[in-house]
Amino acid sequence: MGVDTRKKLNSNSRVGDIIKIKFFAAITKAFNLHPVFQIFIMTDLSQFDPDIAGNPNNNIFGLPFSEEDARLIILPVPWEVTVSYGAGTARAAEQIRKASTQIDIFDSENPEGWKEGFYLRDVDKKLLMKSDYLRKEAELYIDYISKGQKVEDNQFMLKTLKDVNEGSNYLNKWVYDQIKGLLSRGKLVALLGGDHSTPLGYFKALAEKYQDFGILQIDAHCDLRSDYSGFSYSHASIMYNALQEIENLKTLLQIGIRDYSGSELEIIHNSNDRIITYFDKDIKCRLFEGQTWKQITDEIVNRLPQKVHISFDIDGLDPKLCPNAGTPVHGGFEIEELFYLFTKILRSGRQLIGFDLLEVAVGENNWDANVGARVLWKLCNLLVKSNPV
């Protein structure tokens, strides 16, 4: 195909977009349709060329949408107060946004999905400052208890623990309020962390909107610890807290788990199948012995409920894809293995109701952010595809 032909096709496509915009505007005005339909009429894409380099002055992926126009809103949560090893994830959203302009605006599973609008909110500076301050306090506390010192013998450490736990309560309410507000406006919502403690308020807002649902957790860790290191809402406790506080979270299905404690294993065994865990070692053994990934994913999908939220901790991947992750563990998935599973979930007729992407860390280069941006792109396209207007 020659250059002139491609230009003509692109021009025809933009003319088509203008016609669609005018048509939906007329229909919406005439029939007083729900505001969600205005998503398709508020952004004029006739001057946007998805085939050229991404414009860093635009929003995520170089897309030209505003929050009002976009159907899917990504909420950044810059929080890493309780991380117990490497830090850097509080600033992941900024780095992922920069890296995202390198992605081609096309998804083979949903070629037109981006036209519904993806928008990343600006990072809340107050929340980031709060995270930075409490992180310094938490580091002192973690160092203190790691040496076998007793917290009850030190008034300063008792106050530090109290401050961190109060900060986590503040975070949970902040996330819940933000997500609930967006859902009430008819938006699809995703969360971009930040550490894995961040989505509890998100889960609670989803539970109110969708009633019974399940979480598919991609992770190297179970995150089923109770009061880890004394922190009520540690990144290592997110799924424990979700199960304790959200009654209509019916199923937690974990895959890729390869670093866990005996107490967490006991919680799984005593959960009456509310927690279903596919350990990384067991998956690998089944593959080594001749089973296919198709067979394993068929089984996984069949055990999920109708409504599914994906909680994606980046350390669920092979560490070569996320070398700066806060708690890296050898093993893990290739990205395409997970994309295959996610696509199969949608093809089964199940509904993806949301997702979070967490623990992407900032390194010396932008490799982690690049990988994170590509995972985010795929998840955004899957979410809008699973929720047609």
Can you annotate each of these PLM segments?
Residues 43-389:
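Conserved alpha-helical scaffold segments that buttress catalytic/binding sites
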Residues 7-8, 21, 39:
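Polybasic, lysine-rich low-complexity intrinsically disordered segments
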Residues 24, 33-38:
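Short hydrophobic targeting helices and cationic amphipathic motifs
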Residues 16-19, 29, 228:
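Repetitive helical segments and hydrophobic/amphipathic motifs
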Residues 5, 25-30:
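Ala/Thr-enriched low-complexity intrinsically disordered regions
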Residues 18, 41-43:
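Long, low-complexity, intrinsically disordered N-terminal extensions of eukaryotic proteins, enriched
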Residues 4, 10-12, 17, 32-34:
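Intrinsic-disorder-associated, low-complexity terminal segments enriched in Asp/Asn/His/Tyr and depleted
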